[in-house]
């Protein structure tokens, strides 16, 4: 299951005492600010959580899986996320023991 923006807004409404409308607007504004910063070519770093960075990928050769035809994959810019150390430690600490 994935956490949605609506669920984040509902949790904020309860935990902070915002109205549902205010919480929804806050969450939307938060993500809009992240998007705008990335659109401007800047990285986003959230202390204790991680960071979003832009990486430029150069053109590379690819292959059409249906026909086997060689096709170039165009150069592009992608968004990457790197979890911060605190988040990594928290996730690792709460990972259930599994045997391989």
Curated annotation (Swiss-Prot):
Q: Which InterPro entries match?
A: Hist_DNA-bd, Histone-like_DNA-bd_CS, IHF-like_DNA-bd_dom_sf, IHF_alpha
Q: Which GO terms describe its cellular component?
A: cytosol
Put simply, this protein is called: Integration host factor subunit alpha
Which Gene3D superfamilies does this entry report, sorted A to Z?
Answer: IHF-like DNA-binding proteins
Oligomer status and interactors: Heterodimer of an alpha and a beta chain.
Which GO BP terms, alphabetically? DNA recombination; positive regulation of metabolic process; regulation of DNA-templated transcription; regulation of translation
Signal peptide, first to last residue: none
The record's annotation in HAMAP family points to: IHF_alpha
What the entry lists under Pfam families is as follows: Bac_DNA_binding
Report the protein's function: This protein is one of the two subunits of integration host factor, a specific DNA-binding protein that functions in genetic recombination as well as in transcriptional and translational control.
Single annotated GO MF: structural constituent of chromatin
Q: Which NCBIfam families match?
A: himA, PRK00285.1
Q: Source species, please?
A: Psychromonas ingrahamii (strain DSM 17664 / CCUG 51855 / 37)
Q: Is tRNA-binding given among the entry's keywords?
A: no
Q: Which domain of life is it from?
A: Bacteria
Q: Which UniProt keywords apply?
A: DNA recombination, DNA-binding, Transcription, Transcription regulation, Translation regulation
Family to which this protein belongs: Belongs to the bacterial histone-like protein family.
């Amino acid at each position: 299951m994935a956490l949605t923006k609506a669920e984040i807004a509902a949790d904020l409404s309860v935990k902070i005492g915002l109205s549902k409308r205010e919480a929804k607007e806050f969450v939307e504004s938060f993500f809009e600010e992240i998007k705008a910063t990335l659109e401007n070519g800047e990285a986003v770093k959230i202390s204790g959580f991680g960071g979003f960075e832009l990486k430029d990928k150069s053109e590379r050769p690819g292959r059409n899986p249906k026909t086997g035809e060689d096709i170039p994959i165009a150069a592009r810019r992608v968004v990457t996320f790197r979890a911060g150390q605190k988040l990594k430690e928290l996730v690792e600490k709460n990972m259930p023991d599994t045997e391989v």
